[in-house]
Amino acid sequence: RTRGHLARVERARSILRTAVEIAGGVEAVAVFTSWGSDSVPLCDLAMTTLGPVTMVHMASAYEMPGGERVVEHFAARGRVVDIPPSRTLDETVAWLHDIGLGCDRESESAKKITNRAKGDKGAQWAADNGVAVQVLGMRADETLTRRALFAARGPVYRSRGLTIACPLASWSTVDVWAYAVSRGLPWHPLYDCEGLGFTRENLSNIGWLTTHGVTSGRLAWLRRYYPDLHTRITEEWPHLRGLG
């Protein structure tokens, strides 16, 4: 591991300690996790820096299957809370037929609507449970919007009446995987499904009904590694067959 990587790890720990100071105690801090590649080092850093912490997962009706080993690993080390999905799978399918799939809508506005809904739901849970600081796994190099956010406000900022702390703000995907591998941490098996131009560094555990970026080959990847899920989505929306 390079000196730069180690410096970013220490910076992440410093941000976590700042979060506890702002919250007035670790009991008022919650780590929000998707159980994706960024969440693995995020949760491990939080527990090795702060001790047992509350990890909050906003469940989805269409999550990629197979992530149980990750959840079990962290549940054995801290408290895991699942916020149930707002819709069942059938309700989600009906809703998507009504509003259109993500790939059939204007991409950025559709993403903003989804992100805003998730943020509101997380903020409401925090308010209802005495949480003053949300720890998120966002990184600046993921999108131009996030890069601009961190450039303007830093990795710790106020939003929706809460303090948001982002320990991985300066990390790259190389940092994420270097940390996970060096610590011997488990990850979702989908990240081992490398092929068709996808690697661990650019794979994502977005739900299988999420079709943003479908033209980049995600649907073809789904067909190769998760054929049953590919069949389900293309039977529901036949026009997707031409995209993978």
Where are these regions (language model features)?
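Nucleotide-activated chemistry modules centered on ATP-dependent adenylation/adenylyltransferase
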Residues: R1-G244
